[in-house]
Design a protein with these regions (language model features):
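Transmembrane-helix bundle of Major Facilitator Superfamily
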Residues: 2-195
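Hydrophobic transmembrane-helix bundles of small-molecule transporters
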Residues: 171-269
Length: 269
């Protein structure tokens, strides 16, 4: 019994942030925290952004495009982690996210900000699955539950802290600093991961389901476009509204049929 307790204590000590693998876990948590906070941090900054850039009718896209780009790119990058390794994809994801943050910070119009938010979302789509894969690689099955608790706490804290941080930046600095603050933090996470994390890549043969990715991306985009702009740019019962929503729904149905037919599924492991 005493030996079992001692083993549990050693196991707990080996998965903490102060352990040998702690810097890698810290980098993963920081990366995940950045993409999680950016999903909510704009909530309290919207009035200031609209006041500077205009485009009040388009501001919902700041949230939708980020989540859409992330959702579409997650399965793609998850496949690439098996092709070229976790470390390159994680660094690419952080790089895309940081580049998108810089461009968001210097955005000159609402359409430009929306486009750059999509770039952020692509980076987030690489970070999210790769972070969990790295954890699975460096921790045993017995250790993963505790480590996943660390990562889950990041998501929970980010949901609460995000809007608060957005309000602080708007009140005391400028809404652009919501994005600029990601640059040094993302750079530090990438540097730490580059130095501390090493892997032996075992290349596996995977076919990237481009057809599924296109159908999902275009179909979901059209549905979101129809829902966001319906009643604003066109009436709900107008031809554009019905056509956009119908085409989007048909593409999503086609996506479902394609995935049933494929041997290598876009949303599969």
């Amino acid at each position: 019994m005493a030996q079992s307790t001692e083993q549990q204590s050693v196991s707990r000590a080996s998965v903490g942030l102060r352990s040998e693998r702690g810097p890698i876990l810290g980098s993963v948590m920081l990366s995940v925290g950045l993409i999680a906070i950016d999903a909510t941090i704009l909530a309290t900054a919207v009035p200031s952004i609209v006041n500077d850039l205009g485009g009040f009718a388009q501001f919902p896209w700041l949230f939708s495009i980020y989540l859409l780009a992330q959702a579409v790119s997650v399965p793609i990058f998850a496949k690439f982690t098996d092709l070229i390794g976790r470390k390159p994809i994680m660094l690419i994801g952080i790089g895309l996210f940081v580049l998108g943050s810089i461009l968001c910070g210097i955005a000159w119009s609402m359409p430009a900000l929306i486009a750059f938010r999509a770039l952020q979302g692509l980076g987030a789509g690489a970070v999210q699955p790769t972070a969990m894969t790295i954890i699975g690689d460096i921790y045993s099955v017995a250790e993963r539950a505790r480590v996943q608790g660390y990562v889950a706490s990041v998501w929970a804290i980010s949901a609460v802290v995000g809007p608060t941080l957005g309000g602080i930046f708007v009140d005391y600095l400028n809404w652009r600093w919501i994005f600029f603050v990601n640059v040094p933090l993302g750079a530090f996470a990438a540097w730490s991961l580059y130095r501390r994390f090493s892997e032996k890549v075992v290349r596996r043969q995977h076919r990237i389901d481009v057809e599924g990715a296109v159908l999902l991306g275009v179909g979901a985009s059209l549905i979101i476009l129809g829902l966001l702009e319906g009643g604003i740019l066109w009436a709900w019962d107008s031809v554009p509204s019905i056509a956009i929503l119908s085409v989007g729904a048909l593409l999503m149905i086609a996506f479902g049929f394609v995935e049933r037919r494929e041997n290598v599924v876009f949303l599969g492991p």
